[in-house]
Regions:
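Short beta-strand/loop motif that positions the catalytic acidic residue
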Residues: 164, 169-172, 176
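Short beta-to-alpha linker loops that shape the active-site pocket of alpha/beta-hydrolase fold enzymes
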Residues: 2-6, 85, 204-206
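Primarily recognizes the serine-hydrolase "nucleophile elbow" in alpha/beta-hydrolase
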Residues: 20-104
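Mobile cap/lid helix-loop segments that gate and shape the active-site cleft of serine hydrolases
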Residues: 94-160, 166
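C-terminal catalytic histidine-bearing segment of alpha/beta-hydrolase fold enzymes
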Residues: 168-171, 181-246
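Catalytic nucleophile-loop/oxyanion-hole region of alpha/beta-hydrolase
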Residues: 1-38, 224-228
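Acidic catalytic loop of the alpha/beta-hydrolase fold
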Residues: 88, 175-179
Length: 246
């Protein structure tokens, strides 16, 4: 399995990788005893952005000219998104990761400082603490440095939902202070405007990066959340409902 990561993961490279994966699965559907009509895509956080991007751009000839003779090869049957990045301007700009004082930038333990971005733009110093502008840090890796307004618009996915976008199941923790829940609200609203089936769950509790929200995926005690842990069953029921409609 080879795909774009780290400094090589500049858009649209990850999106091209996702399309290749979808096409590969569908091309081998008979061999693998799969029904190519029912291949869903799922992603969480930045992966949620990638899954949603494939779902909104799958039939975009400018984005995917190599599939223009058969866009169905890369069309997801639906998407399952967990705390997804959707709007590139709806991410924490003043994230507290516990940095006291104003240490030198090279002494800060934060692994997402892109070499093409000035650390002074990522680290916000005030009240004897150093905060992280995660919006700048995240977008720098997506675009290889400082993005243009055009790039921000192009990859803020609520702007590109169409009548051919596949159905979506979306969940988000209501206390997410990194990728704000309004990302999910904005995408769900855009889907509804185009009459695309969408199920949205914003749980009252729960922060970012919960995974299954149980002991299987926890790294910290707060990542175990009974409310959010219901999402796999809810998603499975949603998939069944989508399949019944087809």
């Amino acid at each position: 399995l080879r795909y774009s990561v780290d400094l090589a993961a500049v858009m649209p490279a990850p999106l091209k990788d996702a399309a290749k994966a979808m096409a590969y699965i569908k091309d081998h559907a008979d061999e693998w005893y799969l029904d190519s009509r029912y291949v869903f895509v799922s992603g969480f956080s930045a992966g949620g952005h990638l899954a949603a991007a494939l779902s909104v751009f799958w039939d975009n000839e400018e984005m995917f000219p190599e599939y223009k003779d058969n866009f169905d090869r890369i069309r997801p049957a639906g998407m399952i998104l967990g705390y997804p990045v959707i709007d590139l301007k709806s991410t924490a700009r003043r994230l507290d990761i516990g940095i006291e004082g104003y240490p030198d930038y090279d002494k800060i333990n934060f692994g997402q400082v892109h070499p093409n971005v000035d650390p002074a733009d990522i680290f916000v110093r005030e009240n004897n603490k150093t905060y992280v502008n995660f919006e700048i840090a995240m977008n720098a890796y997506m675009f290889g440095g400082y993005p243009t307004d055009e790039q921000i618009y192009q990859y803020s996915l609520q702007n590109h939902v169409t009548d051919t976008t596949p159905p979506a199941f979306i969940w988000h923790g209501g206390e997410d202070g990194l990728i704000y829940p309004r990302n999910s609200f904005m995408f769900a609203e855009a889907l509804r405007e185009h009459n695309i089936p969408c199920e949205l769950h914003v749980f009252g509790k729960g922060g970012h990066g919960l995974g299954l929200a149980n002991e299987v995926t926890e790294n910290n005690p707060w990542e175990v959340n009974e409310q959010c842990a219901r999402w796999p069953k809810l998603a499975a029921d949603w998939i069944k409902s989508i399949l019944r409609q087809q």
